[in-house]
Structures are given as C-alpha cells and as structure tokens.
C-alpha cells in the first residue's frame, strides 16, 4: 500500500515514500510517515486539492514536519492563471503553507524538475544517527534460503551486518544482510528504508 522510490545523487540517495490517498488507507499513510522529516504535497494542476489531501495536511501539521513543500504537477495541462489560482487557493485555505517552497512541474516538458531535484539534494539531513537503533517494520515475509525478511524505516541509530537486535517482544535476532534504499549495504542508517 506504500510506494517507494529512490533518487541517487552524487553524495547521497534520496528516498521517497508515496502514501495512499484514500481515507480507508489512513493507517498505512501514518505508518509510512515514521522517521520522515520532510513532506511534499503533490497537487495536479488540472485537478486541484482532493478531499484526502485536506486530511493528510491536517495530519502533517499535527506531526510538526520540519518542512512541507508544495509541488504542483502537470503544469502542461493548465494555464498560468489556473496554476496561480491553485497556488493562491492553497495559501488561503492552508495559511501554514504560505511560506512553503512551491515548485511548478511537468513530467512531460521537464518544467521545474531540475529546480526540485536541486532543492531536495540540498536539504539538511536530520536523521538521528547517534541514538540507539529504532526500526519500524512494515512488512515481514520469508525468502527460501534467506529466512525471514523485514522491511521498514529506520527512525534512529545505525545497524550493521551481524548486529544482534531485540524485537519489541524481547526476541533476539541477528542481521544477516542489509539492503539500504534498495541497494545491498554493510550498514543501515536512520532515515533510510531498510530490508
């Protein structure tokens, strides 16, 4: 129910979590936000704000995200006047977004994509790497020959291959392999998607 994507950059890999918009998946949306410091509100220029968007914004505001960026997509499907009206509507209806960074983009024409990528690449990392390791598991499955695999987001700390960890039940487990941001790794860090 959660979508994941990664953007490799020169010095780091950005991870994206696409949370479901439908209200019946609200619990999944909340699970996807664990360990996340920045949010992007994605609004299609030709569709505007959906009912679920209002609910998600209320949650993001309550969770006190460091920053909520507004990305208006599909700019090629709307006039400049429609885009400006949408931006004004967002700022009027959600005053806490008035000072947010706004990006007008189009995947078809490439408009605004480089500016958004550059902005994201320069955001400060806020991961709590120097704290004890905490990991929110969102999926568990078995792989023949590998054993139990868990996926989730690291909230704090770091983990390495052969580390021994404790589950919330008190059961001790050992880390055999790590995939960080969908890539094999020796170590996983706070803020990363890990398996």
Regions found by a protein language model. Give the residues of each.
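Conserved Switch II/interswitch segment of TRAFAC-class P-loop GTPases
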Residues: 12-14, 19-24, 34-57, 61-84
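Conserved alpha-helical scaffold flanking the Walker A/P-loop in AAA+ ATPase domains
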Residues: 3, 28-30
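Alpha-helical scaffold elements adjacent to nucleotide-binding pockets in ATP/GTP-utilizing enzyme cores
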Residues: 28, 52-59, 85-93, 115-120
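Alpha-helix C-cap/termination motif
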Residues: 32, 63, 93-97
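Switch I (effector-binding) loop of TRAFAC-class P-loop GTPase G-domains
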Residues: 1-10
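Conserved catalytic-core segments of large NTP-driven translation/proteostasis enzymes
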Residues: 75, 92-195
């Amino acid at each position: 129910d959660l979508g994941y994507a990664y953007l490799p950059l020169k010095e780091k890999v950005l991870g994206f979590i696409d949370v479901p918009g439908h209200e019946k998946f609200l619990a999944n949306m909340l699970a996807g936000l664990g360990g996340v410091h920045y949010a992007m509100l994605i609004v299609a220029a030709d569709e505007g704000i959906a009912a679920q968007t209002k609910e998600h914004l209320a949650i993001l505001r309550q969770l006190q995200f460091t920053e909520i960026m507004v990305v208006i997509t599909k700019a090629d499907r709307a006039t400049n006047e429609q885009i400006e009206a949408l931006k004004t509507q967002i700022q009027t209806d959600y005053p806490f977004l008035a000072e947010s960074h706004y990006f007008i983009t189009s995947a078809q024409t490439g408009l605004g994509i480089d500016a958004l990528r550059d902005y994201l690449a320069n955001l400060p990392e806020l991961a709590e790497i120097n704290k004890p390791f905490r990991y929110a598991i969102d999926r568990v499955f078995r792989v023949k020959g590998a054993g139990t695999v868990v996926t989730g987001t690291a909230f704090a700390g770091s983990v390495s291959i052969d580390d021994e960890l404790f589950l919330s039940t008190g059961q001790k487990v050992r880390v055999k392999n790590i995939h960080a941001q969908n890539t094999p790794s020796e170590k996983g860090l706070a803020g990363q998607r890990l398996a």
